[in-house]
Amino acid sequence: MALLQISEPGESPAPHQRRLAVGIDLGTTNSLVASVRSSVPEVLPDDQGRPLLPSVVRYLPTGGAHIGYKAQAEAVRDPKNTIISVKRFMGRGLKDVAHIENTPYDFVDAPGMVQLKTVAGVKSPVEVSAEILATLRQRAEDTLGDELVGAVITVPAYFDDAQRQATKDAAKLAGLNVLRLLNEPTAAAIAYGLDNGSEGIYAVYDLGGGTFDISVLKLTKGVFEVMSTGGDSALGGDDFDQRIVCWVVEQAGLQPLSAEDTRLLLNKARAAKEWLSTADSTEIDAMLSTGETVHLVLTAETFAELTATLVQKTLSPVRRALRDAGVTVEDVKGVVLVGGATRMPIIRRAVGQLFGQTPLTNLDPDQVVAIGAAMQANLLAGNRAPGEDWLLLDVIPLSLGVETMGGLVEKIIPRNSTIPVARAQEFTTFKDGQTAMAIHVLQGERELASDCRSLARFELRGIPPMVAGAARIRVTYQVDADGLLSVSARETVSGVEASIAVKPSYGLGDDDVARMLQEGFQSAEDDMRRRALAEERVEGERLLEALSQALAADGDLLSPEERAAIDTEIAALRTTMQGEDHRAIKDAVDALSHGTDEFAARRMDRGIRKALAGKRIEELG
């Protein structure tokens, strides 16, 4: 059993005690592993100096497997047993896999997740991904000279719970301890240092081999808010290769291609695409299995014409994501490019023209996500170089809560809870037909929201219209080992969800925490009195709102004398609610509630009669 090295706050373990952790970008086309060495994050290459590991696994009849470049080279002659782009299948059933007819694989529609038939038996996407992760783990341990304590693995922002869990399962199968799953756009932002005091709106344009993602981030002193996401899960660099193949077939007048020749031309197309990132033209030479030969020259201008519609296809989700976030291109402070496909000059020009600025490209787009993950892994492992001022949290220093009606604070995670920790609580709507709910995230020990520290606000929209109190909104607070708070709100009927990520202790030193705690202790009695007052006022408002709607709908059930009596009690409650005596408000609420019991009974009778109107007794049996 490995023992963890614990050091005093402000001190760092000695170099020989440094805990080795890595960041892994498990990509659709390529995967990478990176680590922080001597305070510098860097991608770890293989024994031939290659930083990328193709995300390709070929299964052998002997039961073994080839991974990476060797498997990629064998894909042309053994397409059925060579699994490419397995990330597309993670956590997905057969019906969820896009363009399944264009793949050479034999699928098995197993419960929960699709499986693939190979000569080595039926394999799940989790097992295939585990082969890639195990190769990266071995590369890291060989390079760093010791075992890893864990890894931060990146996933697309749009990955759902099933896909995230599948990624964790693959890591476990590969012998990796997952310190955290990190969203790819957040990792890219961390790599560019955008978490260190940067503020403003940033866009992360991620064009990978098989998918396109756009994320609009709002950074405000440690808060990473994903304002909107978009993209196309079936659009990537592979589609640009496909356009070149179609052009080659047309120009050379080729017959329908076999699977082997298709794979050959796709490899040639990919090489041509990469060459055109730095050259004006390139030659495409190939000998097909039919004996046909190909010799063509592809210019950068022709390539741009062939792929213009694909470029525009990426810009549409960008515009939509900006609209969803409620911002314009002028509001965007910087654009981060992620993914090897963003090396194409046509992409960089198009993105630059759309945003009116030069995109951030000083980091390798293939490596930026892995680098950000490595920086996060180094932090979570507890490493700290001289001069670095990392805030290491082992408990929640202050309570985390949410504002409720009346400006009250409902504590979700109490202070001194050990982390990582997750808590959930259900809330409901206050008014009939309410379709949105504002979530105000707070930090502190006081009972009223105005006395606590505001961390973030976001809205949950799309709640189905229901009567007040019928909707169920589950609010979940989760704090990771690095103190990153993720708050999500989910309406249980429709499934609509919204979320935000916050660093709860950003900008708070020990003195600030102590001050906030002391204020909480000193004000406890007064706070409880104010809380009781606010709670009774909320209860009064809720009763008045419900009664107002009931009188509008069924006021004819009351005699003039009964209506006058109720109106008198309503006026008395409104007057009492303006005072400071919470007990008096409670008494007035109880009086009005009891005074309308008979009215409520009559309304129920009317409702039952309406429901039974025109029904025969036999129908009710």
UniProtKB/Swiss-Prot annotation:
Record's keyword terms, sorted: ATP-binding, Chaperone, Nucleotide-binding
UniProt keyword annotation of Lipid biosynthesis present: no
Superkingdom classification of source: Bacteria
Keyword ATP-binding on entry: yes
GO biological process: iron-sulfur cluster assembly
InterPro entries (UniProt xref): ATPase_NBD (IPR043129), Heat_shock_70_CS (IPR018181), HscA_NBD (IPR042039), HSP70_C_sf (IPR029048), HSP70_peptide-bd_sf (IPR029047), Hsp_70_fam (IPR013126), ISC_FeS_clus_asmbl_HscA (IPR010236)
GO MF term set: ATP binding; ATP hydrolysis activity; ATP-dependent protein folding chaperone; unfolded protein binding
Biological function: Chaperone involved in the maturation of iron-sulfur cluster-containing proteins. Has a low intrinsic ATPase activity which is markedly stimulated by HscB.
Family: Belongs to the heat shock protein 70 family.
NCBIfam families: HscA, PRK05183.1
Protein name (Swiss-Prot/TrEMBL): Chaperone protein HscA homolog
